[in-house]
Amino acid sequence: MKIKTHRYENVQWGRAHLPFFKEFDLYLSNFFEVESVNYNKDGNTFSGPITLINNVGNFGKTPPISDVECVIENSETGETKLLSFTEYFNSYACHIAKSESCTKTLLAHFNWGNVYYWMRRDQSVKSLTKISPWIFLPFQEFDVNSYRIKRGEIKEMDDRMVWLGSGVDSYRKMIRVVENKGYLQPIMNFSHEHYLDKLINSKIGLSYYLDLEKYNTPFDHPGEFCYRDIEYTLLGIPYIRIEFKDTTYNPLLPNKHYISIPREHAYVAYEKYGDEGVADLYINRYKEVINDSEFLEYITKNQIEWADNNILNNNKHKLTFELLELKKWIK
């Protein structure tokens, strides 16, 4: 059985999706004869048309995709499956997803509340049953087990919350407030290796995607998962965050896989006191749990179990294969 994978490979971006797509090609080769087509011929083209067997709406046989998508096509029937790490479903992914030939779409940024509006905008509510939550990945792969072992050998950890990244003076101003109040380790830029060392030496993490003013409609900054969330989870580092609305197929659950701040509390605090109010919610939750070793150990145990079952040991490939229902293609 022959299949073809279509994508624009963006090596320059250096994020997790391209390595995953290539790994998944290899996984698929256990079941099919796989031809992989990279449409980025000059090294600088990161979106554009691909060539399929069947028509996709007004685009005919050449619908556009971006570098965060991969289309898997059955070379005999023209049936397609779509994998997408996009935050903006209505930019490219929607065209493939709503086509008659596409029987399954997996979204890394999936929100049950938003997906209806995404499909409605494209007049494709009937295709909702084909859209499913998927997985999310760390920024890049690393030796998770070795860092887990190192963390287990550390006698004294930094009690302050840890968060490393950018945007704290623009679209993540709340984090700067927490830092200025002394509850967050100094925010710096590190190499990836130094970053991981910083994480495992920390007792508790902070997770935060964007200031709450950004979430105005289902189409504004809809993706709230961050690489840090998965890196914390892989390493078993409890982290505090506002309750997720986005979900993976096997969801990260509040007060099971992370330390939750109720979403409604965050919006009330923001409405009354702005970023300062949200920062105080984080600080108060931190004070509540920092010395509760039983609760933190419970979170860690559940995080590691989730990571092992959904990400590590080829399980991200196995789960993807199952969710795409590719077993039906095996003859």
Regions found by a protein language model. Give the residues of each.
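Catalytic binding pocket for nucleotide-activated donors in carbohydrate/polymer assembly enzymes
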Residues: 200-327
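Nucleotide-sugar donor-binding catalytic core of glycosyltransferases
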Residues: 2-49, 53-257
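Short, Lys/Arg-enriched, disordered terminal segments
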Residues: 1-2, 328-331
